[in-house]
């Protein structure tokens, strides 16, 4: 029986490349001359620390980062940015978290959405991913289109498509 897995992963190497590109752009931009502004990617905690001298500049840096992530194939919705910007001394910063894996509440929404669609497929939660199996390849592709079209707050990838 054909099957595939629904996952939500961010390629850390591509994220590192996007952070490096954003840092290079900030160094060359006129509005960031003589300003302490930087990006730091922490691989262990999968966070990107955006640091600057004012909260307005932090928001500008976040826009630059989102644009660079999008160019590297990482959707902006995979970046979880908290609302409040932390002020410490003369710097402002925010720690944006890269979303890895699908949360259990989102997994349950996806499984319920698949079951409500009345397609002849089964969905099982397996750790951070969802395995979808069915008899017809067309039904599986319909599930893929339905999950892509849903607005659940994070991007999804489809892996291990087996016939």
Swiss-Prot record:
Protein's job: Nucleotide-binding protein.
Keywords: Nucleotide-binding
Biological source species: Escherichia coli O81 (strain ED1a)
Protein name: Nucleotide-binding protein YajQ
Pfam families, sorted: DUF520
Name of the gene: yajQ
Similarity-based family: Belongs to the YajQ family.
GO molecular function, one term: nucleotide binding
Top-level taxon of the source organism: Bacteria
CDD domains per the UniProt record, alphabetical: YajQ_like
Transmembrane segments: none
Coiled-coil annotated residue ranges, if any: none
InterPro entries (UniProt xref): DUF520 (IPR007551), UPF0234-like_C (IPR035571), UPF0234_N (IPR035570), YajQ-like_sf (IPR036183)
GO cellular component terms attached to this protein's record: cytosol
